[in-house]
Amino acid sequence: MKKIIQSFAFIAAAALVLTSCKKDENQVIFQGGTAPVLSASNAGPFVLLKDRKEDPATTLAWTNPNHMFNTGVSSQNVTYILQADTAGKNFSSPKLQEQSIQNDLEFSMKVKDLNSFFSKMELAAGVQHTIEMRIKASLSSGAGVLYSNVLSVTGTPYLDFAVEPPGTAANNYNDG
């Protein structure tokens, strides 16, 4: 009888311990957002010139994606990445270029910035090309990725070197 009472007391105590604690938490659930809308002050066609590399080329602007959670609009920092790729590649080519833009809803590009996108994609200088740009917006944790509309930009890049090679006028090198 003593064993039965002890067993019953143990079961009652265990039940009391397990049912006395209520899980009190506020689960934050991502509910989506609105894709940013990208626009440009000028989409070209640009004729990019090296001697005007510090001049403004265009300003890209986009809307806030308003990432939503079940607790309301996100107050977390949003990371914006400007992506550029050759036209028709659907941002999947190995020459895709990205530039991080922290917590801002616009980016002013100089001629040299725009030319850099063309050059890094290994597009021939002196020939008109079309590239596509979009904004990738994500929360600081990498969650909630939203992409903007695609903007086509046309331009003719110039040849630019970090160090001028031998035989160019800038290096004043005589190879003959």
Question: Where do the PLM segments sit?
Answer:
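Alpha-helical transmembrane segments
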Residues: I11-A15
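Bacterial N-terminal signal peptides that target proteins for export
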Residues: M1-A9
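Acidic/polar, low-complexity intrinsically disordered N-terminal segments immediately downstream
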Residues: I4, K23-E132, K136-N174
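C-terminal motif of bacterial Sec signal peptides marking the signal peptidase cleavage site
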Residues: V17-S20
